[in-house]
Amino acid sequence: NHIEERRKARGMTQQQLAAALGVSRQTIISLENGKYNPSILLAHSIARLFGERIEDIFIFEEEEA
């Protein structure tokens, strides 16, 4: 995903982004490190905050069955 890149481009700290989204800083760290996939609601909130489309921030890969 491109969360860290977008956050830094806007001069935001992880704590500031977490506060703006109503989540913990640890959640932001996990998102940026790709260890956590956000709910659709959180992904939508992140996209709205950055003024971008969800698919421009997140890279969705289909899992093989």
Question: Which sequence ranges carry the predicted segments?
Answer:
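Amphipathic, hydrophobic secondary-structure cores in small proteins
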Residues: 29-44
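Short, charged recognition helix plus adjacent turn
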Residues: 58-65
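DNA major-groove recognition helix of helix-turn-helix/homeodomain DNA-binding modules
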Residues: 41-56
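Residues in the recognition helix of alpha-helical DNA-binding motifs
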Residues: 6, 20, 31, 60
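A short, Lys/Arg-rich alpha-helix, primarily the initiator
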Residues: 1-9
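Short alpha-helical DNA-recognition segment
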Residues: 12-30
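Alpha-helical residues within the helix-turn-helix
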Residues: 8, 19, 48
